[in-house]
């Protein structure tokens, strides 16, 4: 590989090569070796109550610590969505018993490596590449959790073995998974090293009772200790056997939901060395390629002289693609992908682009300023501890002119209810959003100073605005 041809991955020779010249998207699958060698194709959320060990489990499986920000480390909680990728391997020697034949490693590990288990031979071969979306467990951070749920294919529900089940956020998260129609759930009974066997069995019964009648009914319950890495290979085995590989669309025009964005330039950087903004997100469909022209909607939002909203989509070009530390020439749905662009870095600074949609020019959905939704409210507030035998507070009906928080894809924005009739509602959004009819949205209301999930809806139609495009 001398001289480096365009369109071929140069870095990481131990991973499968990606070559744009020979790329045929119709032949790709979520298990194609050249894809899973470099990026994850399944998104798994970790959900559960605060301090039940979600981030620790992700660290045990992937080796990546998802708590990255200073204020998160000090308080030992996850605030922003954390991400980590892990490769799961299976030993090709059939004499090795389960679950020892499964193993997880970080995302830049080679695609196969020889067995180090005494008495076995053969190689560990890559079978899955998963991305963990580590969601915050605090009720105040519920919006972040819902933004994560938009990109999940499956979920690990964590329950700490040394506390009674269910804890408040556990039920709220379970409701969020129901909204997002996540069918594949593994329940992990964590911190098993801290309790006696009888206690663990008793809690097992509590968990069974708690999930009865929910989407998690019948989900496997695996006792683990994330801190001691006990039973982690069983979790790997279940991820491979119980979570089906989602069907992906590789042939449509690509579309990515932006979940975070950054300016990667250091202060004092020379002008010639400035790099464009980086958007991180999950591709919903299609394949993004290096060198491709892209559009970001709604783009730059402003008001004209008469106070009318204007949206100016951002047009740019992809200069690099990466998944954690792996370079990509093309990126497929699943996993968190970093997209290096030529966009002005100040527009991407500190997550400013979150909630925008990035994709092929001219192929993105409409920009809505008002939505008409058919909605469904929860009967009672979730996750609020109540005194004694009193049931949780009832959810009041939507009232005209009240302000709700609306979650659409990865965007959280305010919305004023302008009309309500039976199960239909009209909402005027504070920020315009790029979305389509049929998308699901989550509704939260401010209750005692916290945003609480009160229900969800589906977009039936809405008021759209035409994007303003400069005639250059």
Swiss-Prot record:
SUBUNIT field: eIF2 is a heterotrimer composed of an alpha (EIF2S1), a beta (EIF2S2) and a gamma (Eif2s3x and Eif2s3y) chain. eIF2 is member of the 43S pre-initiation complex (43S PIC).
Protein's name in the database: Eukaryotic translation initiation factor 2 subunit 3, Y-linked
Domain tr-type G: 39-247
Taxonomic lineage from the root: Eukaryota, Metazoa, Chordata, Craniata, Vertebrata
G3: annotated segments: 134-137
Region called G5, residue ranges: 225-227
Region G1, residue ranges: 48-55
One GO CC term, this protein: eukaryotic translation initiation factor 2 complex
Location of Phosphoserine modifications: 16
Gene: Eif2s3y
Gene3D superfamilies membership: P-loop containing nucleotide triphosphate hydrolases, Translation factors
Annotated binding of GTP, by residue: 51-56, 190-193, 225-227
InterPro entries: EFTu-like_2 (IPR004161), eIF2G (IPR050543), eIF2g_C (IPR015256), eIF2g_dom_2 (IPR044127), eIF2g_GTP-bd (IPR044128), P-loop_NTPase (IPR027417), T_Tr_GTP-bd_dom (IPR000795), Transl_B-barrel_sf (IPR009000)
GO biological process, one term: positive regulation of male gonad development
Molecular function GO terms recorded: GTP binding; GTPase activity; translation initiation factor activity; tRNA binding
Record PTM N-acetylalanine, positions in chain: 2
Region annotation G4: where it falls in the sequence: 190-193
Region of interest (G2), ranges: 76-80
Family recorded in the similarity comment: Belongs to the TRAFAC class translation factor GTPase superfamily. Classic translation factor GTPase family. EIF2G subfamily.
């Amino acid at each position: 590989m001398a001289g480096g041809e365009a369109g071929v991955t140069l870095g990481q020779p131990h991973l499968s090569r990606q070559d744009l010249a020979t790329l045929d998207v119709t032949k790709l699958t979520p298990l194609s070796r050249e894809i899973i060698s470099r990026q994850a194709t399944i998104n798994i959320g970790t959900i559960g109550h605060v301090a039940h060990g979600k981030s620790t489990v992700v660290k045990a499986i992937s080796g990546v610590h998802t708590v990255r920000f200073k204020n998160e480390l000090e308080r030992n909680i996850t605030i922003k969505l954390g991400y980590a990728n892990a490769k799961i391997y299976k030993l090709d020697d059939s004499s090795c018993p389960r679950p020892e034949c499964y193993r997880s490693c970080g995302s830049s590990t080679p695609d196969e490596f020889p067995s180090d288990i005494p008495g076995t031979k053969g190689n560990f071969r890559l079978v899955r590449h998963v991305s963990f979306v580590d969601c915050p467990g605090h009720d105040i951070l519920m919006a972040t959790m819902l933004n994560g749920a938009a990109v999940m294919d499956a979920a690990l529900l964590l329950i700490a073995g040394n506390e009674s089940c269910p804890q408040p956020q556990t039920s709220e998260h379970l409701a969020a998974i129901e909204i997002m129609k996540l069918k594949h759930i593994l329940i992990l009974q964590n911190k098993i090293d801290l309790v006696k066997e009888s206690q663990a069995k008793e809690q097992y019964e509590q968990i069974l009772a708690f999930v009865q009648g929910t989407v998690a009914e019948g989900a496997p319950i695996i006792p683990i200790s994330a801190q001691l890495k006990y039973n982690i290979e069983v979790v790997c085995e279940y991820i491979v056997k119980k979570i089906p590989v989602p069907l992906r669309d590789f042939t449509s025009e690509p579309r990515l939901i932006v979940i975070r964005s950054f300016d990667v330039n250091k202060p004092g950087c020379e002008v010639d060395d400035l790099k464009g903004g980086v958007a991180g997100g999950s591709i919903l469909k299609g394949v993004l390629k290096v060198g491709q022209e892209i559009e970001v909607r709604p783009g730059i939002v402003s008001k004209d002289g008469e106070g009318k909203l204007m949206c100016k989509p951002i047009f740019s070009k992809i200069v690099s693609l990466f998944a954690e530390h792996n370079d990509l020439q093309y990126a497929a749905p699943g996993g968190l992908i970093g997209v290096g662009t030529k966009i002005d870095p100040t527009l991407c600074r500190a997550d400013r682009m979150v909630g925008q949609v990035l994709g092929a020019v001219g192929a993105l959905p409409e920009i809505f300023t008002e939505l008409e939704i058919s909605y469904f409210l929860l009967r009672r507030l979730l996750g609020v501890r109540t005194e004694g035998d009193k049931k949780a507070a009832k959810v009041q009906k939507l009232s005209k002119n009240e302000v709700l928080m609306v979650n659409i894809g990865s965007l959280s924005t305010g919305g004023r209810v302008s009309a309500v009739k039976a199960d239909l509602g009209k909402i005027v959004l504070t920020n315009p959003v790029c979305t389509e009819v049929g998308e699901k949205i989550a509704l939260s209301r401010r209750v005692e100073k916290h945003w609480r999930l009160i229900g969800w809806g589906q977009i039936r139609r809405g008021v759209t605005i035409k994007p303003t495009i400069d005639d250059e």
